[in-house]
Amino acid sequence: MPRRRVVGQRKILPDPKFHSELLAKFINVIMQDGKKSTAEKIIYKALDVIAEKKGANHLDILEAALDNVRPSVEVKSRRVGGSTYQVPCEVRPVRRNALAMRWLVEAARKRGEKSMALRLAGEMLDASENKGTAVKKREDVHRMAEANKAFAHYRW
């Protein structure tokens, strides 16, 4: 950690096709082993599949899916005395987006469709309709925070 000044957030370049920073971030989350062009192909193919199935604006569906997966609270471990408590904390907006994208991609990777593009499209469509594994993950995190509400005074 630097001692002199706080390091600012890096500016992310928008994606070349839709000029969206959100999509560029999503491409970076999907990317494995530095293969960005492969990640871009997967995302753009998934968006094409969504456009075929729904006919609506595919970026709106992506935004709706992320909205339904974004957590508002999470639990963090806090050691007090000899025991560890799961303390519910509010999630900052940047982390909220990052978690939503990560959970969507994880859920898509566990699906059964043939290609990653189809899996991702299916998971995004499910999430936009408030169902699917990623939404279930968010519900589990919220349930955990609700169950541990008694330890909220240990927040830092």
From Swiss-Prot:
<dbReference type="GO" id="GO:0005840">
    <property type="term" value="C:ribosome"/>
</dbReference>
<comment type="similarity">
    <text>Belongs to the universal ribosomal protein uS7 family.</text>
</comment>
<dbReference type="Pfam" id="PF00177">
    <property type="entry name" value="Ribosomal_S7"/>
</dbReference>
<dbReference type="GO" id="GO:0003729">
    <property type="term" value="F:mRNA binding"/>
</dbReference>
<keyword id="KW-0699">rRNA-binding</keyword>
<dbReference type="InterPro" id="IPR005717">
    <property type="entry name" value="Ribosomal_uS7_bac/org-type"/>
</dbReference>
<dbReference type="GO" id="GO:0022627">
    <property type="term" value="C:cytosolic small ribosomal subunit"/>
</dbReference>
<dbReference type="InterPro" id="IPR000235">
    <property type="entry name" value="Ribosomal_uS7"/>
</dbReference>
<comment type="subunit">
    <text>Part of the 30S ribosomal subunit. Contacts proteins S9 and S11.</text>
</comment>
<keyword id="KW-0694">RNA-binding</keyword>
<comment type="function">
    <text>One of the primary rRNA binding proteins, it binds directly to 16S rRNA where it nucleates assembly of the head domain of the 30S subunit. Is located at the subunit interface close to the decoding center, probably blocks exit of the E-site tRNA.</text>
</comment>
<dbReference type="GO" id="GO:0003735">
    <property type="term" value="F:structural constituent of ribosome"/>
</dbReference>
<dbReference type="InterPro" id="IPR023798">
    <property type="entry name" value="Ribosomal_uS7_dom"/>
</dbReference>
<dbReference type="GO" id="GO:0019843">
    <property type="term" value="F:rRNA binding"/>
</dbReference>
<keyword id="KW-0820">tRNA-binding</keyword>
<dbReference type="InterPro" id="IPR036823">
    <property type="entry name" value="Ribosomal_uS7_dom_sf"/>
</dbReference>
<protein>
    <recommendedName>
        <fullName>Small ribosomal subunit protein uS7</fullName>
    </recommendedName>
</protein>
<dbReference type="InterPro" id="IPR020606">
    <property type="entry name" value="Ribosomal_uS7_CS"/>
</dbReference>
<keyword id="KW-0689">Ribosomal protein</keyword>
<keyword id="KW-0687">Ribonucleoprotein</keyword>
<dbReference type="GO" id="GO:0000049">
    <property type="term" value="F:tRNA binding"/>
</dbReference>
<dbReference type="GO" id="GO:0000028">
    <property type="term" value="P:ribosomal small subunit assembly"/>
</dbReference>
<dbReference type="GO" id="GO:0006412">
    <property type="term" value="P:translation"/>
</dbReference>
